[in-house]
Amino acid sequence: MDQKAYIDQAAEHFRALLTEQLNRQARMSQGSPAKDFSRMERIVIGLIPGDGIGPILMAQARRVLEKLLAAELACGRVELRDIEGLTIENRTAQGKAIPDEVLAAIKDCDVLLKGPTETPKGGTLESANVAMRRELDLYANVRPVSVPELGIDWTFFRENTEGEYALGSRGVEVPGMLSMDFKVTTDAGTRRIARAAFDFARANGKTNVA
């Protein structure tokens, strides 16, 4: 292809990305209510073993959950549901970061406990974690850090569905000459992660937000 053809192809690609992200911005601006688990009659916890040592870890995690939630499991308030198929073998065979049947099973759950998943080196298969964040709109990455002897009690809120992660694998390339990746930051996305951090601070008696 000549230079003009590459430019035309990239322009069409960018048009599609921009349209997609503007539509996403519009959906976020409308907002959606969060689940109130205290009002739910039944909570389904999905368990995804993943790859490598994931099944070993998940077996022990299940033991802990069964102990901690014994009363809730006995009365049917909570269900532990195994979700199979999010393995490197199945994802590679289907050519999808999250196979359709696995994604459907995930969306039927209220809470998800997931083991580690491997991302193949090379190729174009997206990380299952990144795909899951996008498909389920898991925008808030919440990381608490506590070191009492140093007086540290911090909670970090990181936007999980924007930045380089969102579009980093969907750039454009002119073979042998250049490649470009994209980063997305929306007004609605910025506002909601900031709001989540402030709401957390208010609910937990925190007085400093930075």
Describe the function of each predicted region.
Residues 2-6, 10-14, 49, 57-65, ...:
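General structural feature for long, well-ordered alpha-helical segments within catalytic domains
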Residues 3, 7-29, 33-81:
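N-terminal phosphate-binding or glycine-rich loops at protein starts, especially the Walker A/P-loop
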Residues 18, 22, 61, 65-73, ...:
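Structural signal for hydrophobic packing residues in well-ordered secondary-structure cores
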Residues 41-43, 152, 206-207:
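Nucleotide donor/acceptor-binding cores
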Residues 46-62, 68, 175-210:
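Glycine-rich phosphate/diphosphate-binding loop of Rossmann-like nucleotide-binding domains
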Residues 50-52, 85, 117:
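Short, ordered loop/turn segments at secondary-structure junctions
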Residues 73-99:
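N-terminal beta-loop-helix "entrance" segment that forms/cooperates
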Residues 90-183:
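N-terminal glycine-rich phosphate/adenylate-binding segment common to multiple enzyme folds
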